[in-house]
Structure formats: structure tokens, C-alpha cells
Amino acid sequence: MSQGVEFNRLMLDMRAMQADAMSLPKVTAAPELAPGQSTFADMLGQAIGKVHETQQASTQLANAFEIGKSGVDLTDVMIASQKASVSMQAMTQVRNKLVQAYQDIMQMPV
């Protein structure tokens, strides 16, 4: 008799949970972006492009200095090199934070 009562109570609890779940609003898709708005992926891609441009400019300036092109100063080469280095380090840190955030989300219990 006790098992029958527990089973009935379990069924009532399940029906109550089902009714609660059915009353919740449905999940909707992500809202559409307005024209001119950028996604995170777009911004990240632009940042990577800027880092690449900085490195290319640094390399070109260093090559121009090495061949003795006039108007290219050693200080300009060193500043461009440091800018490229700092931008690469910053991009690496952003990548590390993104990977860590992804791992944290994947380890969350569902």
C-alpha cells in the first residue's frame, strides 16, 4: 500500500512540474542585429586584422632600415616593433581569456 501512495504522490509531483514548465515562456531566438551593428566575432576579426597590419608595418619598417633607406630612423623601427609586440601580447591574452571562459561554461553543470 505504501508503494502505491508513493507512486501516486510521485505522479502528482511530476504533473505539477509539467504544468509549471508549460506555463514558462518559450525560449526565443537571439534578436536580429540592426544595420550597422557589429557582432563580437566581427569586432574580434577587426582586432586581429589590426594586429596583423601593425606587424606588417613593423616588418616593412625594419626591412627598410636594414637596406639603408633614407628617412627611416632606428627609433621609428624600435617603436613600431614594440607596438607590434604589445598588440600581439594583448591579442594572446584575449585569446587566453576566451578559452578560459569557454572552459568555465563547458564545466558548468546543466
UniProtKB/Swiss-Prot annotation:
Main location as per UniProt: other
Keywords: Bacterial flagellum
Protein location: Bacterial flagellum basal body
Gene Ontology CC annotations of this record: bacterial-type flagellum basal body
Keyword Membrane: no
GO-annotated molecular function: cytoskeletal motor activity; structural molecule activity
InterPro entries (alphabetical): FliE (IPR001624)
Pfam families per record: FliE (PF02049)
One annotated GO biological process: bacterial-type flagellum-dependent cell motility
Keyword hit for Metal-binding: no
PANTHER family: FLAGELLAR HOOK-BASAL BODY COMPLEX PROTEIN FLIE, PTHR34653
Family under the similarity heading: Belongs to the FliE family.
Protein name, as recorded: Flagellar hook-basal body complex protein FliE
Lineage, uppermost ranks: Bacteria, Pseudomonadati, Pseudomonadota, Gammaproteobacteria, Pseudomonadales
